[in-house]
């Protein structure tokens, strides 16, 4: 019988029931309540920046709208996704993949990184994420599991 090496409880979308989903605040709260691993979703911005967001649009999580794949990374990373969740999180923004990996490492969290490409961007999203991870040296990334509903993104 294989032994599962990962924690049995993983904070989905960085603990999105307790903090704005897929945010650095969510990572901190997940660690604070004792989670040892988190799951987060990664999509690409128009200019190829991998950012943490679940939906293809901003509509559900932000007080603004737009399609993630049609917006630049700098704009996405300045988008407030905290206020809509609760006023106590006002100013919490969409993090870059780099920021999330750094924070996971600091907090000692393992991560299930779900590659969530916009339609038509499957291969590109997988490659960008793969290159970003490969560029990190030893000790620069947390324990990591890659997942996706897109086979192409994982190739």
Question: Model-derived features: where do they sit?
Answer:
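Phosphate-group recognition and catalysis centered on beta-loop-alpha active-site segments
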Residues: 1-155
């Amino acid at each position: 019988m294989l032994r599962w090496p990962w924690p049995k409880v993983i904070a989905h979308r960085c603990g999105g029931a307790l903090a704005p989903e897929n945010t650095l605040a969510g990572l901190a709260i997940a660690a604070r309540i004792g989670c040892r691993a988190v799951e987060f979703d990664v999509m690409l911005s128009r200019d190829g920046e991998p950012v943490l967001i679940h939906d293809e649009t901003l509509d559900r999580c932000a007080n603004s709208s737009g399609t993630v794949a049609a917006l630049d990374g700098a704009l996405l990373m300045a988008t407030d996704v905290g206020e809509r969740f609760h006023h106590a999180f006002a100013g919490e923004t969409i993090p870059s993949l780099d920021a999330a990996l750094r924070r996971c490492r600091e907090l000692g969290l393992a991560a299930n990184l779900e590659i969530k490409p916009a339609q038509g961007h499957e291969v590109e999203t997988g490659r960008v994420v793969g290159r970003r991870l490969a560029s990190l040296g030893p000790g620069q990334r947390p324990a990591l599991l890659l997942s996706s509903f897109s086979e192409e993104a994982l190739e």
